[in-house]
Amino acid sequence: MEVSPAIARYFEELEGELDAAIRLAAAARARGLDPRTEIEIPVASDLADRVEALLGYKGIAARIRELEAEMSREEAALRIGDDFAARKFGETTPEEILDHAIRAAMALLTEGVVAAPTEGIGKVSLGKNDDGTDYLKIYYAGPIRSAGGTAQALSVLVGDYVRQALGINRYIPRPEEVERYIEEIRQYNNIMSLQYLPSEKELRMIIENCPVCIDGEPTEQQEVSGYRNLERVETNTVRGGMALVVAEGLALKAPKVLKNVRKMKMEGWDWIEEMIGGGPKSDDDDASAAIKPKDKYIRDLIGGRPVFSYPMRKGGFRLRLGRARNTGFAAAGFNPATLHILGDFLAVGTQMKVERPGKAAGVVPVDSIQGPTVKLRSGEVRRVDDAAEARRLAGQVDEILDVGEMLVSFGEFMENNHPLMPPAYCEEWWMLEGGPRHPENELEAIEFALDGVPLHPDYTYMWDDVAPADIARLAEAVGTGGTVEDGVLMIRNTPETKAILEELLIPHHLSGDRLAIREHLAFLACLGLTLQLTKRPAWQDAPMENSLDLVMHLSGFTVRSRAGTRIGGRMGRPGKSKPREMRPPPHSLFPIGDEGGARRSFQAACSSKPRSNTDGGVIEAEVGERQCPACGAFTYKNLCECGAHTNPVFRCPRCGKDVGQDVCPRCNAETVCLQKVTINVKAEYLAAMESLGVRESSVALLKGVKGLISRERPVEPIEKGILRALQNLYVFKDGTVRYDMIDLPLTHFRPDEVGVPIERLRELGYTHDTYGRELVSDDQVLELRHQDILVSEGCGEWLVRVAKFVDDLLVRLYGLEPFYKAEKPLDLVGHLLMGLAPHTSAGVLVRLIGFSKAPVGYGHPFFHAAKRRNCFAGDTEITVSDGRRWMSLPIRQFVTENFDISKPGLDHVGTFYSDPRQPFYVRSIDSQGKTSLKRVTSVSVHRAPAHLVRFATRRGRVLTVTPDHAMLVWDTDYLRKIKALEVAVGDRVPVEEGGLVVADEVVSRETVQALDDRVYCLTVAENHTLVANGIFCGQCDGDEDCVMLLLDGLINFSRAYLPETRGGTMDAPLVLTTRIDPSEVDKESHNVDVCDHYPIEVYNGCLAYAHPKDLDAFVDRVERRLGTPAQCEGFLFTHQTSNISAGPLESTYTRLGSMLDKLEAELDLAKRIRAVDEDDVAERVLNTHFIRDLQGNLNAFSKQKVRCMKCNAKYRRMPLAGKCTRCGGHVIPTVHEGSVKKYLEMSRNICATYAISDYTKQRVEVLFMQIESTFGEPPEKQLGLADFM
């Protein structure tokens, strides 16, 4: 990796600190108190090794390193095809050669992402041309989208490269096949909205000339209407993968394809150059027409999360092009005043669903862009740019006329393949058009305009928001009824005049019965009025077709659109920042059994009822069997009484012999490390307290776990749990403690906003600011090193407690010297942490550099990009569709019948899987509770752990899953994913009743023995959820990103603690990446802008709706710096922000408790925002949330089962005896009246208050009548005397 000397020193410092920590951790581990005597987190391998491990092609890693040393990665991905063609990696058939070469190239191009090379390519085969020759067919699947356009296109090129080497002919399409492609790709665009839709001419050119047949699996439910039942096209269903590769791959990435064709001197691709150079160019109007309002982000609207702007509506977010030091990488900037005026719903770190350019954006504060314009109750119209002023005026706002600007970088358009759009006219654009300096006043701005420079944006109003006729009426009103008094323009206050001024966003206030405008000179000029308020001659031939043209004609100025493009948005997921805890949270991984009670308490176990011939506190537990190699004694502890470290013993569960292998050679049974022992918990607990020198009264509650579920079942020393309890810390499944935070990008910071003295920062290498000046002041801007992070202040306090715990551990348990000696968060600045994200099981080494007041984690885009699957019991019933019919069957049967044994795969957590033999679909659910059909992209088989988790719900649903399986629970009004072990009795899970989604309460959760040696799973596209035994749950997913103290991970993490199941190793630091190579991280970070301004060509391109790739040469992005020393430093930004923690720190959504309060706040805000239709919001909430819940719960009530409170037995109907026939316990319903009526009154109130359609009102009233007939009229409340006083 090419880096500067400064970055090289930075890496050396990090690795020096890491080496010191490793030496200390190794000394602690050598004491023998842990399952292993060595550290269990190795350093991560490079990209080449990841590709080899992912695909299993032995020897490919070394060849990749050789190629990458000589050429670019894209060229290496093509050249590797020569080795496959030469059969260097063991392939035999042409199909196998082609398949492996294409997958290897895909893995290389996507940095080893699983979905692209495995799930994105269905299969590779050969077809027959009409002349009898063979041709190559690549079947693409839906997950190919994750590979990106470049990798998609180059996979076709790799296929052709190897095809030629093998002597296979090109694909010769039939005319009807060409027409089928054109129709199908257009139809797919109507379903899924392609980011780039090629013209018919481009599509025809690609299909007729591409030497490879781009085929695909059916991914959608729709079928094509024409060109059906073609001989060489296997399905009539729309093929999404094919459409993506043709449109967003070959068409969109044609220049990159051509570049590699020329490098490799490949034949048969000349047509690419013709398509690039001779393709039809759309004019401005055509491009503009393509940018239409998109309401997808508000289709699944739910109660409590407000809409801030409807699609492209006046008053909505105005696009501002640029990047601040805390935006980019899917984060958008908003003025803090906007965040406050919008009711504090958008706190720093809140996710917002947006209309474009992507689907979502993280909210961050940028105070150098414009805030909202509001109308106060006094009638005054004022723009608010200051957060303090916004907080002061919040209670006086009558209407939010404009919500302000939204800062979006050029790179976001590039990343999302979205055409550029005209931004709001701003000062940086004005300067590029000749503006000499910021005008001191209005008069100077007019002077600049008279000199030929466009009118300054501060004095440009929203002229294109009003019609030319409105401008004419306003000019008439000002000319006939206006006067200038003491430098203030006074206009007669009429409803029409006031409304037009409000649409123009002209600041004004009421003075008696007149409207007062202080800065009015530019306003009068644009109205074509003189200073004496008389009409200028320009009115005689004024053009009345376009408002901006009219204003420019009347004033003689060049006037730009101040509105630019409006972007819609609504609130998404609220932020989160808190310690990671299992449910219930334990202090120690010590099995306490049922004797610990519901809280798994050591104190309860110690005082449990004495057994015969014991003093009490004695339990029986299933733990791992271990043997001392020195004295031969058998125990459950990691350290023998003789002082030697013990080893796990794996016995055959049938013959009981220690065979020293994973499988018994005699019984062919898998060996287990398991024994049932009697433990005197009280004696062990008191001995641990004494050895630590801790008084028993110091620990009010010490919590263990009910049982152990790993393969080895090692028992963690009680001492560790005691020391955690002293610091109020809870252990995670792998022995570590960790803290979850929402990630936000940051490339620069100031000392005064991170709470660290400049002296300490200088010690850490921050000696100069971004502009090369020596660091002497705490308001200088410093460039963040890409492995330095900021954590929230809450996380800082938590880290201090962890540091004290680790020091206590080193001193009291391991007999070593303390390491951190921290008393306050500042003491930990400069220390190393480990960042961990889901889906990779890889930690990233980072250094703590400061603290954020906002409850988020700020890190470099490279850090976030560097961090980027759980199973069912075999008899779990799932419902699947093959596109023709629905069928219900056990998951074991479905997986085994559809596992393609000829092409099994092995993913990064060691799970075998394959694509299903044919396309299947399941019902899937998103976080808002909306269901849809999604394709099954793979099936998998896993070795079962010893124990599973079984849930039962009030409605009689029962589901058995592995302990780490991703479950869905309702968090007020959205679905949150947690692990099965964290699900608690009382949690509400989504279930399917009569085709509807309703909430069902978990009434029991127990750990059960696995009766089968295998568990099974599906991978589902997009939402990664499905229905199992009637319960919506996850499949293969992760959790939030988190951080942990480095030494805690090095000392306490052990693979031996991890659950023995697929997913058990997820979210665990199996490897540690010590150096982040920008070229190997997620490519989204490569689209981060690193320039300090955009040239005029970019703004002109925005006016022409150009594609960002056409302007790539004008914008300095990370991608252009890869492979040079500048790839890690020298980044700049276009917009300043004074405080990265400005604005609300907690969302109103989180602060409000009940749904009623949240709904009232949502609708009240909708009433006040001009860009929002409150009646439509109310109706959408009814249709997509409340009515669906009411109907589903009512249906469930009528079909419910009854349950025994004692033994949890379920009955379809009440037993005739009126009690449980098994145990005689009391039998109760599983669905209660309150859950059915929950949203009824709220729904009726909405219908009475808002303009709801008659149809929706009638639906609510029908539900009301059905509920009333079911439960009867509510009883009248007995009133007392106090009720009348």
Swiss-Prot record:
Q: Which organism is it from?
A: Methanoculleus marisnigri (strain ATCC 35101 / DSM 1498 / JR1)
- Its gene? polC
Post-translational modification, briefly?
A: This protein undergoes a protein self splicing that involves a post-translational excision of the intervening region (intein) followed by peptide ligation.
Give the residues annotated as coiled coil. none
Top-level taxon in the UniProt lineage: Archaea
Task: List the InterPro entries hit by this protein, alphabetically.
Answer: Hint_dom_C, Hint_dom_N, Hint_dom_sf, Intein_C, Intein_N, PolC_DP2, PolC_DP2_cat_dom, PolC_DP2_central_dom
What's this protein's name? DNA polymerase II large subunit
Region (Disordered), start-end ranges:
565-586
Keyword Nuclease appears in the UniProt entry: yes
Q: Catalyses which reaction?
A: DNA(n) + a 2'-deoxyribonucleoside 5'-triphosphate = DNA(n+1) + diphosphate; Exonucleolytic cleavage in the 3'- to 5'-direction to yield nucleoside 5'-phosphates
Xref: CDD domains:
Hint
